Amino acid sequence: MVNRTSPMDGGAEDSPPEGHKWLKVNGVVVGTVPITGDPEMDLIVAREFLDKRGLRPPPPTKLQSMFRQAIAFATVSRDCHEMLNRQPRNPVYAAPFVVNIAFSIELYLKTLAEAHGVTPWGHDLMKLYEGLPGAALAALSKVTPHVAQSEGLAETSDVGDALANLRTAFVDWRYLYEKESTEMVHIPSAIFVARALHEACLASGIK
């Protein structure tokens, strides 16, 4: 392990040795590796360094990868929503918001189903929802009232009802410029669904 104040780095706390870069695991510096100038080779060198020291984190499971990707698309949709709310309003962010939140919902639904032993397919959100096993629906129903209330909606708000408005949104809104019109999306309901599914995934033990 390389100490940030060791002679190796010339005494500079924030600078690695010349021609090297810091290597971190979970935000902690564990050493330095040479910069080869080739990104792929740099990755190989870093992996070898970590493997030799038993520091390389285990790869995520399929379920973890699905959940993290759902979170990533939900995060992008949140950023688009923030842009939509800025003044003066710019409606150009509406389509990216809908596409990203719809896809995040699709991934959350598939993640939740996978966590309970079902591997679903397709983009139709209602079909994915209707295909959830009982245990997944139970996990979702437990978190729904609290999430609805936190989003300013009635505690009796239903995920299925909200999904009826979103079922083909991912497909319909990707090429919005090619259409004269498309079904409007109720933004608060879309956010409610994404958050409820996120919480249901957490409640199902997915991290």
Feature map (PLM): residue ranges:
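Long, charged low-complexity segments
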Residues: R4-P7, G11-I71, G117-K207
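Short, contiguous, well-structured surface segments enriched in hydrophobic/aromatic residues
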Residues: R53-P88, L107-K110, E114
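Sequence-level detector for tyrosine residue identity
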Residues: H81, Y93, Y108, Y129, ...
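Short, surface-exposed helix-loop/turn micro-motifs enriched in polar/charged residues
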Residues: R89, P96, G117-W121
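Alpha-helical scaffold segments that form or flank carboxylate-/histidine-based iron centers
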Residues: P91-F103
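Amphipathic alpha-helical interaction surfaces
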Residues: F103-A115, G131, A135
